[in-house]
Amino acid sequence: MKIGSLAVLPQKSYAINLLIFKTNIVNKKQAMKVAKLLDAENNILRWNIDRQDVDRVLRVEAVNIGTREIISIIQDAGYFCEELAG
C-alpha cells in the first residue's frame, strides 16, 4: 500500500528534486506519523511510501530541501532512513 501527499505551488518555474530513500516504515500507523511531519514541510511537493517494497521506499519530490533534511525528519520521528543510490 502506498501512502502519500501532494502540494500545489504557485505558477513559477522550480527545479524539482526527486529524492529516494530506504526506510523501516512498515505499517499505516507509522506512515501516518511520518505523514504529519512531511506534510508540514512547505518545500515538499509530493511524497509516497511503498510499504510493500522490501526497502519500504520513500520517494520525495521537493524544492529547496535536500537529502539530509529528509533523513533528519524521518530519523527524528524514530525511523531508519538512508538515501538509495540512483
Q: Each PLM stretch: what is its role?
A:
Residues 2-7, 39-46:
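Short amphipathic beta-strand starts and helix->beta connectors
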Residues 9-26:
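Short glycine-/aliphatic-rich beta-strand segments at the starts of folded cytosolic domains
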Residues 18, 55-57:
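A generic structural signal for beta-strand entry/edge sites
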Residues 19, 24, 32, 72, ...:
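N-terminal targeting leaders
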Residues 23-25, 59-64:
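Short beta-strand-to-loop capping motifs
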Residues 24-42:
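Short amphipathic alpha-helix segments
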Residues 48-54:
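RNA-recognition motif
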Residues 63-86:
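C-terminal structural segments of small proteins and small subunits
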